[in-house]
């Protein structure tokens, strides 16, 4: 597995082009707007993940005021899933949804390491877009159950929080989930660049890269076309 590290900060945004090996003319482009806010475009659809208000660990960041066909959030906390920031069909609750040709499945997962007793449940997501399968675990610290692993499968693209703290996987936990799901591509999210804002309990991405152990690190530019290999995109 290769590790690709971007010189572009999360606030500046990272744009990726992911071709689909399974669908001629398929694939998606992914743009980062910091924290775990990603805009995924492809297959005639657009999906925005986790728009946030500039509070908590997102303090000082530009809010992603965008419009997409579907807006997915792991929770409705202001710094994770602010429904009034972005335009589009907003989904944050578990369930099966079909919107504009997209089939999306949301599953409840503990937001914390106490079975949800402290912060309740988050929603983890899976869907197909542009010939690629996605799993979005951007805001959970709960251990995956055997049923979760079956439902999520082996996604082409895994989006996972890695910055630690009370509601996000830490580096070792995130690396364990990557090994469990064995995705083709990994996009780590929800980590800080530079000094953490006051009161933010998250760290940077380097501990996650270290936890992945012995993988090569390559720096990306602002945009990149990527082959269908096992990669980590930052």
Regions found by a protein language model. Name each.
Residues 20-24:
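Sec/Tat signal peptide C-region and signal peptidase I cleavage site
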Residues 113-181:
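Active-site-proximal loop/helix segments of hydrolase catalytic cores
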Residues 26-41:
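Short N-terminal segments immediately surrounding and downstream of signal-peptide cleavage
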Residues 48-50, 72-73, 105-106, 133-137, ...:
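Structural recognition of the beta-strand scaffold that forms the well-ordered cores
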Residues 37-94, 105-122, 140-151:
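Pre-active-site segment of Zn-dependent metallo-hydrolases
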Residues 171-175, 196-208:
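Histidine/acidic-residue-rich catalytic or RNA/ligand-binding cores of hydrolases
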Residues 9-18:
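Bacterial N-terminal signal peptides
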Residues 232-234:
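Conserved small/polar residues in nucleotide/adenosyl-binding loops
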């Amino acid at each position: 597995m290769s590790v690709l590290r971007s010189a572009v900060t999360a606030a500046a945004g990272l744009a990726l082009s992911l071709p689909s090996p399974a669908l001629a003319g398929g694939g998606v482009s992914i743009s980062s707007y910091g924290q775990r806010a990603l805009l995924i475009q492809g297959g005639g659809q657009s999906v925005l993940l986790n728009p946030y208000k500039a509070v908590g660990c997102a303090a000082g960041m530009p809010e992603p005021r965008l419009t997409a066909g579907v807006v997915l959030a792991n929770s409705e906390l202001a710094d994770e899933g602010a429904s009034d920031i972005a335009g589009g069909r907003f989904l944050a609750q578990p369930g099966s949804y079909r919107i504009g040709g997209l089939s999306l499945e949301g599953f409840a997962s503990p937001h914390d390491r106490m079975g949800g007793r402290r912060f309740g449940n988050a929603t983890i997501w899976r869907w197909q877009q542009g010939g690629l399968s996605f799993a979005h675990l951007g805001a959970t610290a709960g251990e995956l159950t055997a049923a979760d692993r079956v439902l999520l499968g082996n996604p082409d693209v895994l989006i996972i929080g890695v910055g630690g703290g009370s509601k996000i996987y830490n580096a070792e936990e995130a690396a364990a989930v990557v090994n469990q799901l064995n995705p083709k591509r990994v996009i780590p999210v929800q980590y800080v660049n530079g000094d953490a804002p006051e009161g933010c309990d998250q760290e940077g991405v380097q501990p996650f890269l270290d936890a992945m152990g012995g993988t090569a690190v390559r720096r990306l530019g602002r945009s990149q076309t990527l082959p269908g290999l096992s990669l980590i995109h930052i």
